[in-house]
């Protein structure tokens, strides 16, 4: 099913697409969200429990801060390429998609390496330690995924809430929907006060420097690594050395 202008305006209670800031399309059997290209003011969108297979339309939503895509058909983490230029994206829920693969650790590290500005991934807070590890343990995505044809996915949604679904499965969907909406409320009202603009800028600068250092370390031989180790040790000792206190007489 295609997300249409009429559906968007009705759900968002808006008169024009460019005015839409929040949109909830949870469990709507959607396969095509190309209309997102016409919503530059969009800040929060819920697309969980659908059959969306590409993130390309979302790349036009430059103000997007929260993206909920749990239980869709995102095939590959290469789709993250379309999110890398969204400067305000802080919350992403991508769990239960084919792109998550069989290694939860590699999945999380790869997402965080490519989207280091995230503060929450799959309803779990992102830590500075994770961001540092992601530089070494995550895969870097540098190109858009190759696509055959221009379709937005198969017409038969795997997670549609239809008559075939069992009562248990439906109740689980509804419970997860309630949980997801609660999370949205929390992130809207409490945007991690520990991240001040100055702290965020300093953190990004440190991460960029660390990335460069880690990449250069791969090129060093044993002798070079030993030199780096000695230099780092001396630097740490200097930083931890207590400053001399002046005598107060």
From Swiss-Prot:
One of the record's GO cellular component terms: nucleoplasm
Induction: Up-regulated during cartilage differentiation.
Subunit structure: Found in a complex with CFAP410, NEK1 and SPATA7. Interacts with NEK1.
Main location: other
Cellular localisation: Cell projection, Cilium; Cytoplasm, Cytoskeleton, Cilium basal body; Mitochondrion; Cell projection, Cilium, Photoreceptor outer segment
Annotated keywords: Cell projection, Cilium biogenesis/degradation, Cytoplasm, Cytoskeleton, DNA damage, Leucine-rich repeat, Mitochondrion, Repeat
Expression sites by tissue: Expressed in the retina.
Domain named LRRCT: residues: 97-137
Signal peptide range in chain numbering: none
Positions of the UniProt region annotated as Disordered: 146-203
Protein name (record): Cilia- and flagella-associated protein 410
Segments of skewed composition (Polar residues): 162-175
InterPro entries assigned to the protein according to its UniProt record, in alphabetical order: Leu-rich_rpt, LRR_dom_sf
Known role: Plays a role in cilia formation and/or maintenance. Plays a role in the regulation of cell morphology and cytoskeletal organization. Involved in DNA damage repair.
């Amino acid at each position: 099913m295609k997300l249409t202008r009429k559906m968007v305006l009705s759900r968002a209670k808006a008169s024009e697409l460019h005015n839409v800031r929040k949109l909830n399309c949870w469990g709507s059997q959607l396969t095509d969200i190309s209309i997102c290209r016409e919503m530059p003011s969009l800040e929060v969108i819920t697309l969980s429990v659908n059959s969306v297979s590409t993130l390309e339309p979302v790349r036009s939503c430059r103000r997007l801060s929260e993206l909920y895509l749990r239980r869709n058909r995102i095939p590959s983490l290469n789709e993250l390429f379309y999110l890398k230029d969204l400067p305000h994206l802080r919350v992403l829920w991508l769990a239960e998609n084919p792109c998550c693969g069989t290694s939860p650790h590699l999945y999380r590290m790869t997402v965080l390496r490519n989207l280091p500005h995230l503060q929450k991934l799959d309803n779990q807070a992102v830590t500075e330690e994770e961001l540092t590890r992601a530089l070494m343990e995550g895969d870097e995505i540098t190109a858009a995924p190759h696509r055959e044809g221009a379709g937005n996915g198969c017409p038969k949604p795997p997670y549609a809430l239809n008559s075939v679904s069992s009562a248990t499965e439906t109740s689980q969907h509804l419970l997860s929907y309630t949980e997801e909406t609660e999370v949205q409320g929390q992130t809207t009202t409490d945007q991690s006060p520990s991240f001040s603009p100055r702290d965020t800028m300093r953190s990004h600068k440190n991460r960029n420097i660390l990335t460069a250092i880690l990449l250069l370390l791969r090129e060093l031989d044993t002798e070079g690594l030993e030199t780096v180790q000695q230099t780092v040790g001396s630097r740490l000792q200097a930083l931890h050395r207590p400053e001399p206190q002046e005598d107060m007489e």
